[in-house]
Amino acid sequence: MQMRQITAGFVGFGEVNSPRELIERKCQRARAALEEAGLRLVYTAPVSDDPAGIAEQRARQELARGDFDLLVVCLAGWIPSHTVIDVISPFAHKPMVLWGLTGERVEGRLVTTADQAGTSALRDVMDGLGFRFKYVYDTPEAPYAAASQVVSFAEAARAAALLRQSRVGMMGYRDMKLHATLFDGLSLRRVVGTEVEAFETLEIAQQMEQVEAADVAPLAEVILTEWHFDQPPQVAALEQGIRMYLAVMQKVQERGYQAISLIDVDGVKKLLRFPPAMVFMLLADKGGVATIPENDALGAVTQLMVRYLTGQAGAYFEFYEFMQDRVLVGVPDYVPSAVVDGQVKVLMAKFGELSQGVLNVSRVQTGQVNLCRLASRGEHYRMHIVTGQAVTPGVWEEAGWAQPAPRLPSLEVILDTPVEDFAQKVLGQHYILSYGDQRRQLDDLCHLLGIEVI
């Protein structure tokens, strides 16, 4: 997904007795490091502790003219804490980074402005005052290297801002009477910011009847072109799924949903008599929304957290087996094309007493992955995060499918932590997968939102 550019406020500090040219040069280099990393800055010149407080007032006014996701509080040297607090207090509602710069080597000697004297005098003070911030610092061996940590936290700040505006649509409620998918709307809105809206299956069923045949045929042609079927299907076999996709997308557009969860087993399969895998695929790939089955509200919120941090799809997977050093994850329905290795592959399959429907049997990309899940217990929210190496699984099948059983989209994830440790912390059957090492960004986002990481 396309991510908007991050905007950060930036204010530097240095004592009035420190060489002004040196303070300005250090702040400009820090500024350049962030801008080279892609951040847009609302910049104000460095502030000193002048007795009249003129620099403080100027910085507050200049920062107030901009709108930013976070404020970078950059100490280029020692500064009395009251000067910093006076400048940043009007922005206490914003996430912040306390960034201590470092001295420089000049002809073999270290020349320092006591940057970490300033940050060490502020870290606990800012914590005590309730600022939501991350503390990072440079070393003489690696000046401005902490810029990468600032950028990581900035990505978390952007994600937090997007979550405050996010909305999840949920067709039906509590599929299969599951407990692990339940949520508390008020605490979720307070902690994360996401609003979850429920709508009825009947509304979608009625809207499906209103879909024009002329709207179905073009999408059917796209599907037949983009998906590889094991055997050519009849367009009529695809019609119900296309109608449902168009009906749900109308609701998505009306209400501005960024994620969708549908009542699957007790809804689409039981009442409409077809498996909704195809609907989820279209919603993810054509509609551009996060998708997860079974009314999994916190699973959908976890997807949004991953999407807003990384720009990735945030595909859901569920656990099939725990092994000695790995876990088998897979899905009995679909994966978004963003995680498919090669072309999307589907077949017409029958499971149990359900009518035949589209089943995704694509091969899933391997590599370094993160698996994470948000859960709540009362007002307390927790995020379980594990990392590992995803590999192509051995031959396996899920009991219940008509033979020959399909090869479901799946991975074996060799965990970086012992499986037993993972198992004793697991929070539900659905976890959200992302590629690369996203642990730091997830940690930062949870820290910002007050979510415990386990």
Each model region followed by its residue ranges:
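Cap/lid and interdomain-hinge subdomains that line or gate substrate/regulatory clefts
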Residues: 3-8, 41-42, 104-233
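Periplasmic-binding protein-like
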Residues: 68-77, 97-99, 257-262
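Extended hydrophobic packing segments that form well-structured cores
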Residues: 356-454
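N-terminal basic/disordered segments at the start of proteins
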Residues: 1-35
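Short, acidic/small-residue loops that bind anionic groups at enzyme active sites
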Residues: 87-113, 121-127, 132, 281-295
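C-terminal catalytic subdomain
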Residues: 287-399
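Long, internal scaffold/assembly segments composed of regular secondary structure
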Residues: 222-309
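Short, well-structured alpha-helical segments in soluble
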Residues: 55-68, 85-88, 245-254
